[in-house]
A protein has these predicted regions:
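A conserved catalytic-core segment of Leloir-type glycosyltransferases
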Residues: 11-56, 74-141, 204, 213-219
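Conserved donor-binding/catalytic core segment of Leloir-type glycosyltransferases
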Residues: 237-258, 264, 280
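Short alpha-helical segment that forms part of, or immediately flanks, the ligand-binding pocket
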Residues: 323, 346-350, 364-365, 371
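Aromatic "clamp/platform" in nucleotide-sugar-dependent glycosyltransferases that forms part
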Residues: 337
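Short hydrophobic beta-strand element within catalytic cores of glycosyltransferases
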Residues: 354-357, 367
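Conserved acidic donor-binding segment of nucleotide-sugar-dependent glycosyltransferases
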Residues: 369-370, 374-380, 388-393
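A short, well-ordered alpha-helix in the C-terminal region of glycosyltransferases
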Residues: 388, 395-409, 416-422
Length: 441
């Protein structure tokens, strides 16, 4: 077991960008991507960005660290700047009752029957009003505002005569929300000029344009870049992971929807047939998730001091450590009960790891049965697939090749950036059926 904060000291040792700013890291990053996706793709991005030159684009979410949204914005914002957009990232601030309310909203959008009091709703609106006062100089001058998830959604009502276009970006599966909570949230998002969902199946009908933009990973980020063997081995030694024995791993926030206790159950069932099996459960909390520590304690109880269960509560910036842990694993799990897109799946596939994932959300379109991994609906099903892969090394090797090729084709950051640029071109072009772009260099 490793307590919260155990890996704090790893950043300086493993992360050679510890003292660099985002702008330092991203300088001329587009040229670096050409080595991954090719010059033609970069040329398309420059061509799409030409009519957006100088446009003031503001992204608003609820945290700078922890969770997939923050990770995406850390990379998208500097890339948009390099393409000539005036891209800005702001974060709403809140207190414990605010995050309690928005966590309940988040769960309810994904189908949980959450009860939210009128007092808590009123507090949610109060915090949004306070953030409006702070952010008004930025938002009132924006050409495009992209609001991520429920936390800042109520900002819109403070801009009835706004200058720019406002877009609500929903990152979770809203296909079957708890209706009382959705009715409340809908009155805040119905006024947006458009909405973005990660998959068609996630969307709720609105009398506004709906866009589908799956998220992505950055192949050059600290979490996904290739690592030297020596660095991977240092991480392995730090957490006492035996290199001679098989390893399964799940990386995610300590959240009940990620089913970490179910992962432990699957591990124990598989271990009956593979006594040398090891499990890594690595993750942390996000600043806007008040339940993380509580769930971590539940997982500690379930692990019951098993020396082969490596339970790691990592800080939000332990990106290279997570990278190494995924590379150490033979098989990666993401046994979610509810899921948005599931970027931890994308990260694992990019590293050539077969994934055993819950048959929910965006995991369904990433984990192709018998090709990039297996979809499961129970700890027993996960254990069966773990056993299968550990005894079929050729099948694992084929899945490894398929996994990386699948992400390269579909889920890298350059594709995500292209779709955001195309969306903004479409929005500023209004009802025109044909949009002329300047020829890229």
């Amino acid at each position: 077991m490793y307590p919260q904060g155990k890996s704090e000291g790893l950043k300086g040792e493993f992360d050679n960008t510890a003292d660099k700013t985002d702008d330092d890291i991203m300088t001329k990053m587009l040229e670096q991507y050409a080595g991954v996706v090719g010059e033609e793709i970069i040329g398309h991005l420059r061509q799409l960005a030409e009519p957006l030159n100088g446009m003031r684009v503001v992204h608003i979410n609820s945290t700078r660290e922890g969770g997939g949204v923050a990770e995406i914005l850390h990379r998208l914002i500097p890339l948009k700047k390099e393409l000539g957009l005036n891209a800005i990232w702001e974060v709403v601030s809140g207190d414990a009752p605010f995050y309690q309310c928005t966590k309940k909203m988040h769960n309810a959008i994904q189908g949980d029957r959450e009860d939210i009091s009128e007092e808590l709703y009123a507090h949610y609106e109060l915090i949004n009003a306070q953030n409006h006062e702070r952010l008004e100089p930025v938002l009132s001058e924006a050409d495009v505002v992209i609001i991520h998830d429920p936390q800042p959604a109520a900002l819109l009502k403070h801009y009835p005569e706004r200058k720019g276009k406002w877009i609500w970006r929903c990152h979770v599966d809203a296909s079957n929300p708890h209706r009382p909570v959705w009715r409340y949230l809908r009155k805040h998002v119905i006024g947006y000029d458009a909405a973005i969902y990660s998959l068609p199946a996630f969307a709720q009908p609105m009398d506004k344009p709906l866009y589908i933009v799956p998220p992505s990973i950055d192949p050059l980020s600290e979490k996904n870049v290739s690592l030297p063997d020596e660095e991977i081995e240092r991480v392995r030694a730090t957490y006492d992971i035996d290199p001679e024995r098989p390893v399964i791993c799940q990386v995610s926030r300590f959240d009940r929807f990620k089913d970490p206790v179910g992962v432990i159950e699957a591990y124990r069932l598989a271990k009956k047939f593979h006594p040398d099996l090891q499990l890594i459960l690595a993750g942390g909390g996000a600043a806007d998730d008040p339940e993380g520590e509580e769930v971590f304690k539940e997982v500690e109880t379930a692990a019951a001091d098993d020396p082969d269960v490596h339970l790691l509560m990592l800080p939000p910036d332990a990106h290279r450590t997570i990278n190494a842990l995924q590379r150490i694993a033979d098989i990666v799990l993401q046994k979610s009960l509810k899921e948005g897109f599931g970027l931890t799946v994308t990260e694992a596939l990019w590293k050539g790891k077969p994934v055993i994932g819950g048959n929910v959300g965006g995991i369904r379109i990433q984990v192709v049965n018998h090709t990039t991994g297996f979809l499961v609906s129970s700890p027993e099903g996960a254990a069966l697939r773990i056993r299968y892969l550990l005894t079929h090394s050729k099948r694992m090797a084929a899945m490894s090749r398929n996994a990386k090729a699948f992400v390269t084709e579909n889920y890298l950051l350059t594709r995500h950036l292209r779709e955001y640029l195309a969306l903004m071109v479409a929005i500023i072009s209004g009802s025109r059926n044909r949009i002329e772009l300047t020829r890229g260099s």
